[in-house]
Regions:
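Acidic, low-complexity central loop/insert segments
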Residues: 3-5, 11-14, 57-167, 171-190
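Residue-level signal for inorganic ion chemistry
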Residues: 17, 67, 105, 225, ...
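Short, intrinsically disordered, mixed-charge
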Residues: 25-33, 75, 79-87, 234
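Anionic-ligand-binding alpha/beta catalytic cores of soluble enzymes and soluble regulatory domains
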Residues: 150-162, 171-241
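Short amphipathic beta-strand starts and helix->beta connectors
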Residues: 41-55, 85-86, 126-135, 229, ...
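Acidic, proline/glycine-enriched N-terminal capping motif
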Residues: 1-55, 59-62
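Short, surface-exposed ligand-recognition loops at beta-strand->loop->(often short) alpha-helix junctions
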Residues: 14-20, 104-107, 246-252
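Glycine-rich, small/acidic residue-mixed loop/short-helix segments
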Residues: 208-215, 230-309
Length: 309
């Protein structure tokens, strides 16, 4: 079964021109040479102090490089990038024509032939035609994986209708619909945190696990904030890491935690459904962590798969 979600929490930046790829290579944490028509990458833009302004997914759309960022961050990111783009042959702009729709692919049955058209490798990209890209989001849990569809509104809705049909040749007239909370919950359980305007320039890559989850490439050359990010990775051991937690009950949007290792309550960075992401002292699996408002509600800590890579 496949369900679709309008992911209105994202917007797009387009970099066009002969210098687009090389310019971005000198500004962001990912290796832009790894972006191909069949492969996207995750990355971040940092400030001079090594704090994350925005995270993004970068993909090749035609001859351009397109960045998907959190809603409200396209303009701040453009303002930073344009300061350094004066002598480069490229155009940087917010792309209001592109939209993103999420697919929750729940298992695979005998009649799910359409899922064979979707990418299966981490962050892989396939073209579905009509200008629509399908991108593996790198998130999965409990037999469900996340796939992004990029394109203009009517095109991605038509592609979603085809993907959610039990017959790959006949689109559903009524598309099975999930919610943004369903999508975010799977991201949280996979240890994925996205920067919002409220989180922008507040955290280092290490605090968000970007240094171990593939958002930062330590083999590429210099970029803004690189010296600080690299020093923290190679010369220090984080005292805190971002951990997914989940409860047996739905969590309030303002829920806070009590951790036996901390003297103060902890405010999570993201909450959806019964799951949350919170910065905890390392090695929390053996500690008791409860809701601050209801000590009888215990939360289970999960280590993301990238912890063991």
């Amino acid at each position: 079964m496949t369900e679709s979600i309008q992911l209105s929490q994202f917007e797009f930046i387009r970099a066009s021109g002969p210098d687009a790829r090389t310019f971005l290579q000198g500004q962001v944490t990912c290796d832009t040479t790894q972006i191909t028509p069949t492969q996207s990458v995750l990355g971040a833009l940092c400030n001079l102090k090594g704090r994350v302004i925005a995270d993004f997914r970068a993909a090749q759309v035609g001859e351009d490089i397109v960045l998907k960022v959190g809603t409200g961050l396209a303009e701040p990111v453009l303002a930073v990038l344009k300061k350094y783009a004066v002598f480069s042959k490229l155009t940087l702009s917010k792309d209001d024509e592109l939209a993103v729709l999420g697919l929750l692919v729940r298992g695979k049955g005998e009649d799910d032939a359409q899922s064979d058209t979707l990418p299966s490798g981490p962050h892989a990209v396939t073209s579905l035609g009509e200008g629509v890209l399908a991108i593996d989001a790198g998130c999965s849990d409990e037999g469900t994986r996340c796939v992004e569809l990029w394109g203009n509104g009517p095109s991605i809705e038509a592609s979603a209708a085809l993907q959610t049909s039990s017959d790959a040749r006949t689109p559903n007239k009524t598309v099975a619909v999930a919610t943004i909370s369903d999508w975010t919950r799977l991201e949280i359980l996979s240890g994925v945190i996205h920067i919002t305007p409220a989180l922008s320039e507040e955290y280092t890559p290490a605090q968000l696990n970007y240094d171990i989850s593939g958002v930062v490439n330590f083999k590429k050359g210099c970029y803004t904030g690189q010296e600080i990010v690299a020093r923290m990775f190679y010369r220090s051991t984080p005292k805190k890491r971002l951990y997914p937690l989940h409860a047996e009950i739905p969590l309030a949007s303002d829920a806070e935690l009590n951790d036996s290792a901390s003297e103060t309550t902890i405010k999570p960075l993201a909450i959806a459904g019964n799951a949350m992401l919170a910065l905890l002292d390392t090695d929390p699996l053996a500690r008791e962590i409860t809701l601050a408002s209801e000590a009888s509600v215990k939360l289970a800590v999960k280590e993301p798969d990238y912890f063991t890579k």
